[in-house]
UniProtKB/Swiss-Prot annotation:
The gene is RDR1. PANTHER family: RNA-DEPENDENT RNA POLYMERASE, RNA-DEPENDENT RNA POLYMERASE 1. Belongs to the RdRP family. The lineage of its organism: Eukaryota, Viridiplantae, Streptophyta, Embryophyta, Tracheophyta. It comes from Oryza sativa subsp. japonica (Rice). One of its GO terms (cellular component) is nuclear RNA-directed RNA polymerase complex. This is Probable RNA-dependent RNA polymerase 1.
Length: 740
C-alpha cells in the first residue's frame, strides 16, 4: 500500500486485509499488487479544488498541475524496486477514497489479462458504468462454494405493470444451500435469511426460499456482465444489528413533526446505559450486544459471567471504558443514538406476493441469540442512509405473515403498488442496502410527504469500446467532481437555519443535487452546486474551528451541547493498579517453570501490537483490541480500515495461542499437560507489579495487559475452579466437624 502526496510518496508495508475475488485467484502474485491512495499533505482526501479551481468550466486549461500529475501516475504507472505498477481497477469504495489497485505485470500476466479474466465488459459503452463493473470483483468478500451454471435458475424481474423493477438486485437461495454457505462463512449457529453475494457477473442479494430446489435463482437485474467465474462470494448477510439515529434521520424526523424532547430523552437514555455499563455487570452484558462482534466480545462476556466486576478487573474495565468513550464520541460528532425498538436491516422482497403496498414484514431477534425471535406489528418508520429529502422517511404498517416467518433480521418489502418502497427511501434497491427500521411510537412522525423522484440522469453512450485510458481519466475527473460531502454539509447547515428545516427550498435543491452526486459513479453526470448554496457560516455542532460559526438553536445543537457535558474516563494500568488488582487466584503450582518463556512471548506480542498501533496511529491498547477506535492517523479511516485492523489483531492473538500450545514441547513435539501453569505464568508476567513497565523500556508506550487474555478460556477455568473450591470449603468443614 502507498499514499501519493502532492509532492511526496509514502510507502506502507503489507497489511492484513479482507480478501477479494481477484487477489484470491492471483494469490501467487500477491507481491505484484499495490493499493495507491491520492491524498494531500495532511494525509487527507484530495479536494476538488486541488485539481480544478471552483470557477473551472471543465476545460483542460482549467486543470491544475496536480490533476495532470494524478492522471500521469495512473496512465504511466509508478516504478518501485524495479517493478512498474500499472493501473488495474478500483472498487466503488476505493473510488470514494481516491484509491485504486495497481499491478506489476510479469511474463505471462499483465493487468489487462486480469481484467479479461474478470469478465466480458465489451457491451458496456458508458465509462462510469464500465469502471463500476470492473470494480465489482474487488469488493471485500468471503469465498464459499462453487455452483455450476446448470444449478442456477434464471427468474424474471417483477415490474408489476410499472416502470419500476420491484425485484431490483434480489434473487433466491434454497434453504439447504443457504446452510452450506453459512458453514463456509463460519456461521455454525444459524443460516442467515439473506446473503449479499457476487457470482460471476451477478451482484445483489439472495434470500432463502424454503420451497426452492435450485441452489440459486437469479434475475436479470442482478446480471452486470458476463463471466465464467462460478464461485459464490459473500460480502454480507442478514444478522442482528442495533438501530441508531443519526443527524440526517433526526433532521428529517424533526422536520416531519417529531418533538425535540423525544430525541433529547433518547440521548439521555443512551448515556445512562453507557454510564451504568462501567459499574453494573448486567448493564455491561446488555451493552456487549452493541460492541463490534467477535472474539473480544465473547471474552468480555465470559469475564462478566465468571463474576468479574466491570470496574475491578483492569482488562475488562479498560475495554468497557473505551467502548463507552467511543459511543460518547459518536453521540457528540454524529448524534448516533441507540434506539432499542429499532434495527438496521437488510432489505428483501416478498416472493409470496402476500404483502400489499404500504405493508412490510419484520421478524427480529432480541440480540445476537437468533433463537429469541419476535414479529413486529403496527406502524413502523423506515429510511435508508444517507437521506436528505423528507420523503425518504416512510411510515409503513408491519403485519404478521406466517408464511414469511423464515425471514428474520431483515425487512421484507412488498412487490405490489405503484412504486417499490425501497426506491422511495433515497432511491434504494434490494442489492444489499441496509435500512433503519423502528417501531418506537415516539419516533413515528405525524405526517409523511411524497418521496422524491430518483430516476437517474441519462448517461452518455460511446460509439466505441471503453478504453482503460478513459477509465483512468474518469477516476481523475471523479476527484474534480466529487461533491457528496460538500452537499451533505450544506444540507445540514440550511436544515439547521431555515424555518422549514429539510422542507426549505435550499434543502430540497440540495437533496436533488445529492441524488445526482450519488449516481455520478454510475452515470458520470456531475452535480454542480450553485453559488447561493455554498455555506458561509456553520453551526457549532459541526466543530468547524477554522470557519465562522454560530450557536445552533435546532435539535442537533441542543443534543450536541448536552452531550458535551459527559466526558469519557479511561483508567490506565499503573504500577499502583497492578499492586491493587493482581489476582492471587491465578497462581497455579508450577507456574515458575514457564516464567522465562512467558516473558519472551509477551515481549514479542507487545512489540507487534505496539507496531500495529504505531502503523495505524492508534493511541491505546484498549482501542485496537476492542475495535472501538477513538482516533487514528489521517491516512486511515475507521470506516475503510476497521476490517483490516480487526484481522491484524485477530492474527496476532491467534499467533499467541499457537505459541502457547508450543510452549515447553520436547524435540518430538510432545509435552505434559501443564496448560494451567503456563496460563498462570502468562498472567503473572503481565499483572504482577514486579514486571510492570519492563516490556516498554525504550518505547513511549504504556504497559500492555491484553497478552494473557489471548487464552482467556484457560484463565477463566482457573478462576472458576478457585471460586468453586472456596464455595465448597464451608461445607467440607461442616462435614469434617460432623465426623469428629
Amino acid at each position: 500500500m502507498m499514499d501519493w502526496f502532492m509532492s511526496t510518496v509514502y510507502f506502507y508495508g503489507p497489511e492484513i486485509n479482507v480478501s477479494n475475488r481477484v487477489v484470491r485467484n492471483f494469490s501467487s502474485d500477491i507481491e505484484n499488487f499495490l493499493r495507491i491512495s491520492f491524498v494531500d499533505e495532511d494525509c487527507e482526501k484530495l479536494r476538488a479544488t486541488d485539481l480544478s479551481p471552483r470557477s473551472a468550466s471543465g476545460h483542460d486549461a482549467n486543470r491544475t498541475a496536480l490533476y495532470k500529475r494524478v492522471l500521469s501516475v495512473l496512465s504511466d504507472g509508478i516504478t518501485i524496486g524495479g517493478k512498474n505498477f500499472e493501473f488495474l481497477a478500483f472498487s466503488s469504495s476505493q473510488l470514494r477514497d481516491n484509491s485504486a489497485w495497481m499491478f506489476a505485470s510479469r511474463q505471462g500476466l499483465a493487468a489487462s489479462d486480469i481484467r479479461t479474466w474478470m469478465g466480458d465488459f465489451r457491451n458496456i459503452r458508458n465509462v462510469a458504468k464500465y469502471a463500476a463493473r470492473l470494480g465489482q470483483s474487488f469488493s471485500s468478500s468471503t469465498e464459499t462454494l462453487k455452483v455450476q451454471k446448470y444449478e442456477v435458475e434464471e427468474i424474471s424481474d417483477i415490474k408489476n405493470g410499472t416502470q419500476h423493477v420491484f425485484s431490483d438486485g434480489i434473487g433466491k437461495i434454497s434453504s439447504a444451500f443457504a446452510n452450506e454457505v453459512a458453514m463456509k462463512c463460519n456461521l455454525k449457529r444459524f443460516a442467515p435469511s439473506a446473503f449479499q453475494i457476487r457470482y460471476g457477473g451477478y451482484k445483489g442479494v439472495v434470500a432463502v426460499d424454503p420451497t426452492s430446489r435450485w441452489k440459486l435463482s437469479l434475475r436479470k437485474s442482478m446480471l452486470k456482465f458476463q463471466s465464467d467465474n462460478i464461485t459464490v462470494d459473500v460480502l454480507a448477510y442478514s444478522k442482528y444489528q442495533p438501530g441508531f439515529l443519526n443527524r440526517q434521520l433526526i433532521t428529517l424526523l424533526s422536520t416531519l413533526g417529531v418533538r425535540d424532547s423525544v430525541f433529547e430523552q433518547k440521548q439521555e437514555e443512551a448515556v445512562n446505559q453507557l454510564n451504568k455499563m462501567v459499574t453494573d455487570p448486567q448493564a455491561a452484558i446488555e451493552a456487549i450486544e452493541l460492541m463490534p462482534m467477535g472474539e473480544i466480545t465473547n471474552a468480555v462476556k465470559e469475564l462478566l459471567l465468571c463474576g468479574y466486576q466491570p470496574d475491578d478487573e483492569p482488562y475488562l474495565s479498560m475495554l468497557l471504558q473505551t467502548f463507552r468513550a467511543s459511543k460518547l464520541l459518536e453521540l457528540k460528532t454524529k448524534s448516533r443514538i441507540l434506539i432499542p425498538k429499532g434495527r438496521a436491516m437488510m432489505g428483501c422482497l416478498d416472493e409470496t406476493r402476500t404483502l400489499k403496498y404500504g405493508q412490510v414484514f419484520i421478524r427480529a431477534t432480541s440480540g445476537v441469540n437468533d433463537n429469541d425471535r419476535f414479529t413486529v406489528t403496527g406502524k413502523v418508520v423506515i429510511a435508508k442512509n444517507p437521506c436528505l429529502h423528507p420523503g425518504d422517511i416512510r411510515i409503513l404498517h408491519a403485519v404478521d405473515v406466517p408464511v414469511l416467518h423464515h425471514m428474520f433480521n431483515c425487512v421484507v418489502f412488498p412487490q405490489q403498488g405503484p412504486r417499490p418502497h425501497p426506491n422511495e427511501c433515497s432511491g434504494s434497491d434490494l442489492d444489499g442496502d441496509i435500512y433503519f427500521v423502528s417501531w418506537d411510537p415516539s419516533l413515528i412522525p405525524p405526517r409523511m410527504v411524497t418521496p422524491m423522484d430518483y430516476t437517474p440522469a441519462p448517461t452518455e453512450t460511446l460509439d466505441h469500446d471503453v478504453t482503460i485510458e478513459e477509465v483512468e481519466e474518469y477516476f481523475t475527473n471523479y476527484i474534480v467532481n466529487e461533491s457528496l460531502g460538500m452537499i451533505a454539509n450544506a444540507h445540514v447547515v440550511f436544515a439547521d437555519k431555515e424555518d422549514l428545516k429539510a422542507e426549505s427550498s435550499p434543502c430540497i435543491e440540495l437533496a436533488k443535487l445529492f441524488s445526482i452526486a450519488v449516481d455520478f459513479p454510475k452515470t458520470g453526470v456531475p452535480a454542480l452546486i450553485p453559488p447561493e448554496l455554498h455555506v458561509k457560516e456553520y453551526p457549532d455542532f459541526m466543530e468547524k474551528l477554522d470557519k465562522v460559526t454560530y450557536e445552533s438553536k435546532g435539535v442537533i445543537g441542543k443534543l450536541y451541547r448536552e452531550i458535551k457535558k459527559h466526558t469519557p474516563h479511561i483508567k490506565h494500568f499503573t504500577r499502583e493498579v497492578a499492586r491493587r488488582s493482581y489476582d492471587t487466584d491465578m497462581i497455579v503450582d508450577g507456574y515458575e517453570d514457564y516464567i522465562t518463556e512467558a516473558m519472551a512471548l509477551k515481549d514479542e506480542y507487545d512489540f507487534k501490537l505496539g507496531n500495529l498501533m504505531d502503523h495505524y496511529g492508534i493511541k491505546s491498547e484498549a482501542e485496537i483490541i476492542s475495535g472501538c477506535i477513538l482516533k487514528m492517523a489521517k491516512n486511515f479511516t475507521k470506516k475503510s480500515d476497521a476490517d483490516a485492523i480487526r484481522l491484524a489483531v485477530r492474527s496476532l492473538r491467534k499467533e499467541a495461542r499457537s505459541r502457547f500450545s508450543e510452549m515447553s514441547l520436547d524435540d518430538n513435539g510432545h509435552g505434559h499437560d501443564a496448560s494451567e501453569a503456563k496460563a498462570s505464568a502468562w498472567y503473572h508476567v503481565t499483572y504482577h507489579p514486579e514486571f510492570w513497565g519492563c516490556y516498554n523500556e525504550g518505547y513511549e508506550r504504556p504497559h500492555f495487559i491484553s497478552f494473557p487474555w489471548c487464552i482467556y478460556e484457560k484463565l477463566l477455568r482457573i478462576k472458576q475452579r478457585r471460586k468453586f473450591v472456596r464455595k465448597m470449603q464451608p461445607e467440607l468443614f461442616s462435614l469434617h466437624n460432623l465426623r469428629i
